């Protein structure tokens, strides 16, 4: 979900998702007809609600809380950024989740789930009674005002309606720091007269 637009480059926005969605995949070396094949990099693509595809690069990841912030090119400024809530979730309050479990998603269609915040569990993760399946990871949990209070990163296969999110404070801190880093990188490129449409795939010296 788009959480911020760049103040440096008009066609760059920031999308928040789960950290494991941004991890580099490991591929074994392959030899075909005597030629060694190596994977050079992973490309990322974000698909909007309207079905448009946008190139993306990783700005930052937090492995402890399983968070990732992407820089995305070409998102319209008419698309409103979804803010991080000023206050975290409260026990017994209903929250909403927009997700694509099992990849069930189409142009102009996104599944909406609802459930209640139940408190902290295990290693301090925020726990919700929201249905999750593979494909739900990285989807936002919203309050009634449409503000982000959580990000689904895991569930329990044996329990239908349990969703885990990084603790709320970790999300707001991560987004603030990662956004600042992404904007700093763009500012450096801008002042080097570099092509900022390449986003942070270019690393300023």
Task: Locate predicted features.
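N-terminal activation segment of mature serine protease catalytic domains
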Residues: 1-18, 26, 57, 67, ...
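Catalytic nucleophile loop of clan PA
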Residues: 2, 131-152
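Active-site substrate-binding loop(s) of clan PA
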Residues: 2-6, 24-36, 57-61, 71-106
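Catalytic-histidine neighborhood of serine endopeptidases
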Residues: 3-63, 154
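Terminal peptide-recognition signature
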Residues: 13, 17, 56, 70, ...
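Short, solvent-exposed secondary-structure boundary/capping segments
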Residues: 65-72, 124-130
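Flexible, gly/ser-rich surface segments that form the specificity/activation loops bordering the active-site cleft
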Residues: 77-126, 131-136, 152-164
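C-terminal subregion of chymotrypsin/trypsin-like serine protease catalytic domains
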Residues: 122, 142-205
